[in-house]
């Protein structure tokens, strides 16, 4: 596996592209603190998107869940964003490092390149 650093100046564009490519894909969201404690915020839920939390902030919002229940997790004061890739160069996980030493990972249940996906992600009825 390889990791690709995303330049801070292109976070908005990269996160927007990531969200459009992977909306509806099944992910798990975990946080690891600087002391090594691990918490799972969400497991095996559809990704809604990853974006700046607000226009005036560098904080990053991660939205996951069904259309009936959406969970949003915010990463405050991010200092680095990385994409972890499989050997086939498919996106495996998006990793966000925060100033306080916390690392938030959005990991795909089934990593694959977007062009390998057959069809359109399932959308729940409203």
Language model feature labels by segment:
Residues 74-126:
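Helix-rich interaction surfaces within compact, conserved domain-sized segments
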Residues 45-93:
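Acidic, aromatic-enriched beta-alpha/helix-loop junctions
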Residues 23-32:
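A short, Trp-centered hydrophobic/proline-enriched beta-strand micro-motif
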Residues 36-46:
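Short coil-to-beta-strand transition motifs
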